[in-house]
Amino acid sequence: MLLNQGIFAMHIRYSEMKMRAISTLSGLMRHHGTDPREFLNATHQFPELGDMLVHENALRHALMRLGGRKLVFSNAPRHYVEQVLGAMGVRRYFDAVYSIESTRYRPKPSSAGFHVLMRAHKLDPHRCVFVDDMLENLRAAKRLGIATVWVSHGVTKPRYVDVRVASVLELPRHVFRNARG
């Protein structure tokens, strides 16, 4: 999802809320027997989603220029991820979508989800690139041998981040020799 400068701070707060919601879901499942499908359905209802997203035609062009297979790996429920990708007009540029349901409700940064995705697509982690805005997720990917790209306006790049970009539109300019496949 591309975010303009005006809503960047809101995105940071939302990212923090996502991590709390994921922790909340795990706790509700473990301690209260909550049905994760019901929880995720109730917490991911956005009738005005299309109006909430920043649409940039350049995103489609950037995705077309990226080589290799492209997979979406999200902690959100499938219906929401598909809705976002569809509203942005980019679904066709991705080979597969992995949602929290795909990982049996073990969200990033758990390595379990990465393993599910890599097994299903017969991926060598040393030939993959993981792009995310959450450092915890990037750290988990790096531990598995995956090259990492941090989408952030942050200045200090941690050691486990290979490349920092301010926008996903910058991705085609970065070539990863180890990410063919």
List each language-model region with its residue ranges.
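N-terminal helical cap/lid subdomain that shapes the substrate entry/recognition surface
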Residues: 1-57, 79
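Short, contiguous strand/loop micro-motifs
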Residues: 11-13, 46-50, 68, 101, ...
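Flexible interhelical turns and helix-capping residues at alpha-helix boundaries
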Residues: 18-21, 32, 70, 74, ...
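A general structural signal for well-ordered secondary-structure junctions
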Residues: 28, 49, 69-70, 91
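Asp-based, Mg2+/Mn2+-dependent phosphohydrolase catalytic module
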Residues: 37, 64, 71, 77-78, ...
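Short, surface-exposed alpha-helical recognition segments that flank or form part
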Residues: 50-54, 72, 105
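Catalytic-core regions built around general acid/base machinery
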Residues: 58-67
